[in-house]
Amino acid sequence: MELQKIASSSKPHPPVVGKVTHHSIELYWDLEKKAKRQGPQEQWFRFSIEEEDPKLHTYGIIYTGYATKHVVEGLEPRTLYRFRLKVTSPSGEYAYSPVVSVSTTREPISSEHLHRAVNVNDEDLLVRILQGGNVKVDVPNKFGFTALMVAAQRGYTRLVKILISHGTDVNLQNGSGKDSLMLACYAGHLDVVKYLRRHGASWDTRDLGGCTALHWAADGGHCNVIEWMIGDGCEVDAVDAGSRWTPLMRVSAVSGNQEVASLLIDAGADVNVKDKDGKTPLMVAVLNNHEELVQLLLDRGADASVKNEFGKGVLEMARVFDRQNVLSLLEERKRKQMRKKSSVR
């Protein structure tokens, strides 16, 4: 039997708009007395919600059933949508309601917007977000970094100032224990380092490995930052929690940077300090084949006769690990010392 339209005078009212968000629209409709649910379900009125395709201007069914409410989800923010209600009687007659138009709301400001503003170095957007008061300034991103950490790491000094003026905690640490000061020191952003220090950042903070900001600055190799840090009073011979390495030891292990090593030694770093295995900065420089740093350490008082806790010295280490250039340097140094002793006699 062919379905018949309900008389136009019996057209249903358009769906009523309920709660609207940036991604959803709630629609509901009232049952008239004649459409009360009595008897088996096949004797009930059935409802369909149809949504208009804005390009084709055709309607597609997004819900059909016996409920009197439906929430349309997965919508775009600030977008106009058009819906109509289709009511089908138990006998198969049907009618469409007038169309209802409704727009989704603006996407609410979230922590993602905060971090996006910092990532693109957008001062105006950052200020608007913070002044809106809907986002906590210290909420971390998916990597565990606060907005201040990201700004400090990238050297966005003006953003750092904005964030601090809005109450960010300069001493918060990420998942590995690094704070904004460590990140700025490693990246070499001296202006940021100075500003963080003026606003309470501490040289005494340790990451999960026990490293200080100076350890990270030594890895970064930015001499202007290291020089200022030393002048500002950070501890030159702080040891980490794992290998008990000082910043000078990290230079020997990581970069071999002579300028950084010289700055640290000039500031009083112990050239003969030992780590948990009894290794000195000289031994570590030999093992990592940092020839020029080996020369510098020897010139600055490193003791080549020291043995580690396994009884091994720098010459033996150079031979075992085939550090030929370093070995030649050490042997020549030893010969000169022998000749000097002989001439004294």
UniProtKB/Swiss-Prot annotation:
All copies of domain Fibronectin type-III, residue ranges: 11-108
Compartment(s): Nucleus; Cytoplasm, Cytosol; Cytoplasm, Cytoskeleton, Cilium basal body; Cell projection, Cilium
Chain coiled-coil ranges: none
Chief place of localization: nucleus
Protein modification: Polyubiquitinated. Polyubiquitination leads to proteasomal degradation.
ANK repeats: 109-139, 143-172, 176-205, 209-238, 243-273, 277-306
UniProt KW Repeat keyword: yes
Assigned GO CC terms: ciliary basal body; cilium; cytosol; nucleus
Keywords in alphabetical order: ANK repeat, Cell projection, Cytoplasm, Cytoskeleton, Nucleus, Repeat, Ubl conjugation
Top-level division of the source organism's lineage: Eukaryota
Record has NADP as a keyword: no
CDD domains registered for this protein in UniProt: FN3 (cd00063)
Any single GO BP term: positive regulation of DNA-binding transcription factor activity
SUPFAM superfamilies tied to this protein: Ankyrin repeat (SSF48403), Fibronectin type III (SSF49265)
Pfam families linked to this entry: Ank_2 (PF12796)
Domain comment quoted from the record: The fibronectin type-III domain mediates interaction with COPS5 and RYBP.
Subunit structure: Interacts with COPS5; regulates the phosphorylation of JUN and the transcriptional activity of AP-1. Interacts with RYBP; may prevent the ubiquitin-mediated proteasomal degradation of FANK1.
Function noted in UniProt: Through the activation of JUN and AP-1-mediated transcription, may regulate apoptosis.
Protein name (record): Fibronectin type 3 and ankyrin repeat domains protein 1
Species whose genome carries this gene: Bos taurus (Bovine)
Gene this protein is translated from: FANK1
